[in-house]
Amino acid sequence: GFSQRLGFFPEVGPKTPGKRRFWVQAVSVGEIEAIGPLLRQLKAAGTAEIVLTTTTSTGYRLALDRYADVADRIGIFPADLWPCSALAWRRIRPDVVILVEGELWPEHLAQARARGVPAYLINGRISDKSFARHQRFRKLSHYVLGHFQQIAAGSEEDARRFRALGFDSTVTGNIKFDVASDAPMPAEERGRLRTELGFGADPRTVVLLGSSTWKGEET
């Protein structure tokens, strides 16, 4: 893992004729979970090679578990420093780069622009603190965000903030809501779980779940 952080990404090999190579960076577990539908759609199209990277060890393990049959290569994202990033870029040679949510890696994006590779931000988010910081350092913000060909915002509020900073943004919705379970939980297991949580096994009991109560995520 450490060698990959330095840019020594495993050689991906020659590109397949007729396919574009997508480098998708999802920082950790939440983002890795969320990008499943996107990766599977790219794979199903039959015209994409997928290189998936993540920043954390837990994200890496989850990526291997979930997407070994989807991604052509899974690895660790390089440190966002010129020598490390440039080395990884020479090894991966992507045609498209995709970042998820609030990830802004200036050197990674600079490498994309220098090579004429389009960069996209999906599920784009700007928190209250980040928005204030972007407004305060507007010149730096424009330099970084200006590398994206397109910004797909996770909510109307996020899109409004991107626009306030001078960047066009479309609202695609939060891709985390697109993640569906592969199969329903068996009734017996469902009843056991309800009992363990103190709700009782009666399926008629109404249970309200607040799964994500961070400001801006309540629905």
Model-derived regions, located:
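Long, charged amphipathic helices and adjacent flexible linkers at domain junctions
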Residues: 2, 176, 180-199, 207-210
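A periodicity- and composition-biased signal for non-globular, repetitive helical segments
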Residues: 11, 31, 194-196, 200
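Active-site and donor-binding regions of nucleotide-sugar-utilizing enzymes
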Residues: 1-184, 213-216
